[in-house]
Swiss-Prot record:
Primary localization: cytoplasm
Coiled-coil segments: none
Gene Ontology BP term (one): isoprenoid biosynthetic process
Organism: Listeria welshimeri serovar 6b (strain ATCC 35897 / DSM 20650 / CCUG 15529 / CIP 8149 / NCTC 11857 / SLCC 5334 / V8)
UniProt name for this protein: Isopentenyl-diphosphate delta-isomerase
Lineage: Bacteria, Bacillati, Bacillota, Bacilli, Bacillales
E.C. designation(s): 5.3.3.2
Enzyme class at the top of the EC tree: isomerase
Annotated catalysed reactions: isopentenyl diphosphate = dimethylallyl diphosphate
Entry-linked CDD domains: IDI-2_FMN
Cellular component GO terms held in the UniProt record: cytoplasm
Gene: fni
Entry-linked Pfam families: FMN_dh
Binding site for substrate: 12-13, 158
Length: 358
């Protein structure tokens, strides 16, 4: 029985990657397209003046983007994690691994995650567990990678579509609070592509969580992945569940939104999406599906070159936004249009204030 469970988990990991890569073959429209930064025609800064450094979970990092959680737990995904770690090392960005549940249940799979630390010994690495994982096991996940932080992924929609998924969730909040109290490293609670409302973030803040990853709809769709894995595909009506990255970011502009550090991810396509997310308060921006798609299509070296180009493009966008650093970018005026404006209005967001921040 244990062997069958292990094989099922390994197969699921491989299917997640294959289906996720397929989803990212074409860039979909994004809610971030409804955001327009108000720039300048007479910049105060030169490109060389721009400071892209940021702070996430108390750690200073040189760039405001990172490789988000995606994979690990099978022989195939070990090679992917090794390649992602090389990219993270060469570009000097943090990275997260996918859920480590497989390795916690089967120690022979630990190396599919530990390869990340082997390839990137001095990098910033985030471990990853579900709130289903007991705290003592979550601490093992941290030790497994000598991790700098721990992501706890919350994914009720994915679990419900997954035939073998969890069906009990009421204990999650207490488990997260226990992690906050006992973890030797910072905790990041993240969605997996269904977004967080300010109410969800407030609930997490009340149990001591200091950083969340909003992880909105628009990138890798795990409801679709799990539905595609089902023979009956019985949950096709749930494929549009959740709120987008743009909606999550706009929701955090509400006057009653909790004071908390937040990261943005979900459907990030280019440097402009990163800048818009930072302007709406994110401290850094995560990418998973697009990075793995680029890795599969173009290889490690070309993906590194692409992200190195993004660094220069980000500096240019900061110049156009008349912002020397992320703190100034967060004060840049921006217009919210279209369906995203409709969302903001009915959620009580002061969009006029956002359009006249400086």
């Amino acid at each position: 029985m244990q062997k069958n469970d292990d094989l099922l988990r390994e197969r699921r990991k491989d299917e997640h990657v294959a289906l996720g890569v397929k989803q990212n073959e074409q860039l979909a429209p994004s809610s971030l397209d409804d955001i327009q930064l108000i720039g300048t025609s007479i910049p105060r800064y030169n490109v060389k003046d721009i400071d892209l450094t940021t702070t996430i979970f108390g750690v200073n990092v040189s760039l405001p983007f990172y490789i988000n959680a995606m994979t690990g737990g099978s022989r195939h995904t070990k090679k992917i994690n090794a390649d992602l770690a090389e990219i993270a090392r060469e570009v000097a960005i943090p990275m997260a691994v996918g859920s480590q549940s497989a390795a916690l249940k089967n120690s022979s799979l630990m190396d599919t995650y530990q390869i990340v630390r082997e390839v990137n010994p001095s990098g910033i690495i985030m471990a990853n567990v579900s709130p289903e994982v007991a705290v003592q096991d979550g601490l093992r996940a941290i030790e497994m990678l000598e991790a700098n932080a721990l992501q706890i992924h919350i994914n009720p929609a994915q679990e419900l579509v997954m035939q073998e998924g969890d069906r009990s969730f009421s204990h999650w909040l207490a488990r997260i609070e226990e992690y906050v109290k006992r973890s030797p490293v910072p905790i990041i609670v993240k969605e997996v592509g269904f977004g967080m409302t300010r109410e969800t973030v407030k609930t997490l803040r009340e149990v001591g969580v200091e950083t969340v990853d909003l992880a909105g709809k628009g990138g890798t769709n795990f409801a679709q992945i799990e539905n595609d894995r089902r023979r009956d595909q019985a949950y096709d009506f749930l494929l549009d569940w959740g709120i987008s990255t743009g909606q999550s970011l706009i929701d955090m502009q509400h006057i009653d939104a909790p004071k908390i550090a937040y990261l943005a991810s979900g459907g990030i396509r280019n440097p402009l999406d990163i800048v818009k997310s930072l302007a709406l308060g994110a401290d850094s921006v995560g990418m998973a599906g697009q990075i793995i798609y680029s890795l599969k299509k173009d290889g490690v070296s070309n993906t590194i070159e692409k992200l190195e180009l993004w660094k220069e493009q980000l500096r240019g966008l900061f110049v156009l936004a008349d912002a020397k650093n992320i703190a100034e970018l967060k004060e840049t005026s921006l217009i919210v249009n279209g369906k995203l404006a409709e969302w903001g209005n009915v959620r009580g967001i002061d969009l006029v204030q956002l359009a006249n921040r400086k």
